[in-house]
């Protein structure tokens, strides 16, 4: 029976997509098409009566706690494997956290330390699982690590310290004093090159210890040279090692001894390891492009040529000689200026070479030459150096004050109306008249005549004043003669006295007395204000006529003589106005 069932043939149902036996296929097909339907979403057969329940239970959209929308039948799998907010356990402290915060927590939690009970060392929590494998072995390794023998140390230093020696060689190559400067100026610069060394660093005991260390260094290098196999360029590296050790040992040495030992060692090293070899041969050993300096004609690498020419240029080193500007501190000799320049260059470069300065390496800062003396300085120090540089020219004067003209240099402008006013106001007192009056009052005391003194001398005084004011005076414009205005009684007395003087001579006992200037007013003064209405003139004329009617005949005669003299004055004033208008 089982064999019969296995050997029977099957057919695929078009509705439910299942294999149906052939002998039962017809009945299944009729039942399947009537009662069973295919789910359009999951392509699974379900009874048509349960299709709505299946769609609501399996294929409806739900939202996860991570705000992701998906079908309900996939929610469980998403929460277990894909949701970022699912809970996970920390591998160090067994604390449940979300996946988003788990990594940050594990990094912090694993960085804690716990004391190991076996070796007594503090071990990181994240290394506790692997620590038992290495527990107790680290102490044995440290005990096995003995101090490095001097030979091994020298070998490692000789291989790894070539870079340091090359840096020292570059500084020596960039240094001009070993090749160009004589030894005498360098020795003259002892006090300035090492000016920052204290007296405690210049004692004799330091020199002895440094020399002993130097000899030990030489013996050790000779020992290493004999033990190491000969290789190409060995002598060069040994020479560089010797120079580096020498520069390091010279720190804190006295200025004169350090300078002499340094240059002597450099010369001896060149003679012993290369014979007549010079620094130019060392420069060419690196197969670099060498170009000559246009000032000193020495060969320098291409990348160092610009910096060297900037410092080697005599026009930059001696700016005061080229521009002709005078320094406010006095004009110095060219030799003195050049020596100052060499002194600054030697002090800056020797300090960096001998290790006496705590400045940073050249590679870490920008080196810019001073625009006055040409000395190369760091960018941070350049501003302060140029402010106090000896070669700095005099500060220019303020041009603002120069542009303002002086008051005394401006031409005095005179109004064109002034001469015309002077001509019109013929009654104005001239400056000459006032000066004469002041001089006469200063020469003799002025006092009023007493009542008992006869007024016989008034005529002489009046004539003298009229003569002094009528004459031309240099530097002053001519003014019309001023006639003193007297009262009626005085005029009568004067007229009577003149008549008496014609008949007889003046009494010798009388002295001419000048009245004060306040009592002498010109009679023909013209007011500067505009005249009033005609009515006022009419009234004044009537009143004046009334007053004139009461004047005595003597006073009238005196005024008539004065009126006769006025037309000539007015005629002269009119001529002056015509000349000014032309």
Swiss-Prot record:
- Cellular component per GO? mitochondrion
Q: Which PANTHER family match?
A: TRAF-TYPE ZINC FINGER DOMAIN-CONTAINING PROTEIN 1 (PTHR16295:SF19), TRAF-TYPE ZINC FINGER PROTEIN-RELATED (PTHR16295)
User: What intrachain disulfides are recorded?
Assistant: none
Q: Check the record and name the InterPro entries matching this protein.
A: Innate_Immune_Apopt_Reg, TRAFD1-XIAF1_Znf, Znf_RING/FYVE/PHD
Keywords of this entry: Acetylation, Metal-binding, Phosphoprotein, Zinc, Zinc-finger
Looking up Gene3D superfamilies in the UniProt record yields: Zinc/RING finger domain, C3HC4 (zinc finger)
Q: What's this protein's function? A: Negative feedback regulator that controls excessive innate immune responses. Regulates both Toll-like receptor 4 (TLR4) and DDX58/RIG1-like helicases (RLH) pathways. May inhibit the LTR pathway by direct interaction with TRAF6 and attenuation of NF-kappa-B activation. May negatively regulate the RLH pathway downstream from MAVS and upstream of NF-kappa-B and IRF3.
What GO MF annotations does this protein's record show?
A: zinc ion binding
Output compositional bias ranges, type Polar residues: 454-471, 486-495
Give the multimer and partner information. Answer: Interacts with MAVS, TICAM1, TRAF1, TRAF2, TRAF3. Interacts with TRAF6.
GO terms (BP aspect):
negative regulation of innate immune response
Residue span of region Disordered = 217-236, 401-582
> N-acetylalanine occurs at which residues?
2
Q: Can you say what this protein is called?
A: TRAF-type zinc finger domain-containing protein 1
Positions where Phosphoserine occurs in the chain? 191, 278, 320, 326-327, 409, 415, 430, 470
The segments annotated as TRAF-type zinc fingers are: 27-103
One matching Pfam family is TRAFD1-XIAF1_ZnF
Instruction: Please name the source species.
Output: Homo sapiens (Human)
